[in-house]
Amino acid sequence: MSLLGARSTYRWFSIAASIPTKNAIGKSTYLLASRNQQYRGIITSTVDWKPIKTGKSPNDDSRRERSFGKKIVLGLMFAMPIISFYLGTWQVRRLKWKTKLIAACETKLTYEPIPLPKSFTPDMCEDWEYRKVILTGHFLHNEEMFVGPRKKNGEKGYFLFTPFIRDDTGEKVLIERGWISEEKVAPDSRNLHHLSLPQEEHLKVVCLVRPPKKRGSLQWAKKDPNSRLWQVPDIYDMARSSGCTPIQFQALYDMKDHPIIEEHTRNEASQNNSTSSLWKFWKREPTTAVNGTQAVDNNTSKPRSRQEMPTDQTIEFDERQFIKAGVPIGRKPTIDLKNNHLQYLVTWYGLSFLSTIFLIVALRKAKRGGVVSQDQLMKEKLKHSRKYM
């Protein structure tokens, strides 16, 4: 066989061997798997010998994505110091106004009581607030109303409101007589009737004028229309249910005894004594019972009427005696207006100062950029290498 024939025969067998058969496909798969198994242990280098250079900064994409959110945050940070500074300035004006108002009310408390004008209307309450006035007339004890419960010295009780008929105008007004314990709410359970349930027709009562306030939206309203109990002093509702003028009068704190004086005795006393006062105070000797209507003379052992008692001193009770007897404890002549505007002023100005500092820090950080550029990174690396290498 010639050389040419041998080559052609080898080529033909090579072509025939390349034709895929069932056994050939299995062998090729096995060879490929074994070859991959051979190359798995080879570790290639991870060093990028030719790094990709670009002029694009990593900050570009992040700035585009977060530009809208940053604008909102910066807008709020700019607005916060301005708004808080304005509110602080507004509290300065409020502080001046409240200080003048409290000073004016304290000045009114120093004035002597005067008779309430006949033409007094609810619109005048603001100008007459904390002014002492004298009301002459009689109480309607069968129309008493209560606000509470309220605690006093750890004891449960209520504020007592009683309608009052004026002698000069016949007008029906509402007087807050004071605090009374829960056990003495019923009139039959009270003692010292000349103080707890005065029945005089021409009684004089010293009160403070207070402007009526409406019930707040978050305060409880009275659910039972037939009840005489309110949770809060809703003067308009109380006046409407009792037919009174919507004006709030608060009886003053008074622990002194005010015995009933007959009309002829009052006229005789006015002739013999040139000094006149709002109440006629009488002295009782130590043997005199407080609740009784008569006293016993130590010399004659005979009972004496109120008109025969000495009048040079005054009996004065304490609060505990009034609580046990069921006598309402009036309001002390003090100002209850709160003045917290100085605290609000410091709070708003402090918030303005702190928010300004945060804004300056945020602007400085935004100016430097959130991500380090390639040039800055290269400079930092060279600086580090010179220092430690």
From Swiss-Prot:
In which compartments does the protein localize?
A: Mitochondrion inner membrane
Q: List the residue ranges of the region (Disordered).
A: 292-311
- Mitochondrial matrix-facing ranges: 1-71, 363-389
Q: Which example biological process does GO assign this protein?
A: mitochondrial cytochrome c oxidase assembly
Quick check: keyword Nuclease in the entry? no
Mitochondrion in keyword set: yes
Membrane topology qualifier: Multi-pass membrane protein
Q: List all membrane-crossing ranges.
A: 72-92, 342-362
Annotated Pfam families: SURF1
**Molecular function (GO) terms listed?**
unfolded protein binding
Source superkingdom: Eukaryota
**GO CC annotations on file:** membrane; mitochondrial inner membrane; mitochondrion; peroxisome
Q: What else is known?
A: Present with 623 molecules/cell in log phase SD medium.
Q: What is its quaternary makeup?
A: Interacts with COA1, COX14 and MSS51.
Q: What does this protein do?
A: Required for efficient assembly of cytochrome c oxidase in the mitochondrial inner membrane. Involved in a step that couples MSS51-COX14-dependent regulation of COX1 translation to early steps of cytochrome c oxidase assembly.
* Family the entry assigns: Belongs to the SURF1 family.
Full protein name = Cytochrome oxidase assembly protein SHY1
Tell me the organism. Answer: Saccharomyces cerevisiae (strain ATCC 204508 / S288c)
